[in-house]
Amino acid sequence: VVEGGHIKVGQEVTCILPKADRPYTAAVITLSDKGAAGEREDKSGPAIVEMLKSAGYDIKETLLLADEQFLLEKELMRLSDQRQVNVIFTTGGTGFSERDRTPEATIAVCDRMANGIAEAIRNYSMTITPRAMFSRAVSGIRKKTLIINLPGSPKAVKESLDFLLPNLEHGLGILRESEGECARK
């Protein structure tokens, strides 16, 4: 129903069918102490949003947080439990700095890990730069929400999503129980 009212005999009715289980919903969280303090512009979060919108995703929320594990855990739980988004992308906080706690927060809230996603992104990124070996990014599942840690740089975010997005909908479809087997056709 697009708008309320009554249908009269003889009135033309148009049926608008939703795309099959689309659009997928997403949230994007940027982790950056300097960004949260207003000392640095967030370019990675908006880059993720732009790429997801271009791919047909419905962006439900974007956040910019300081590198605080408890804050990230709280937001990951809220976005998956209350907002029930299909996928949450984080950017930043995956390196070796003492304040980089994104993987720990993700692991703390996930019911199951999706190690293959982070491994595949890291493996692909290694073909671009050997510094990808320093990523501690992880991916996991909380209830029906997939959580994916991405790097903090806009360039690395774009490279990661160029690699990931063509196959991501299959995994999201399995989580939403609208797709089944992983076997190739």
Predicted regions and their residues:
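Short beta-strand segments
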Residues: 29-30, 90-91, 149-151
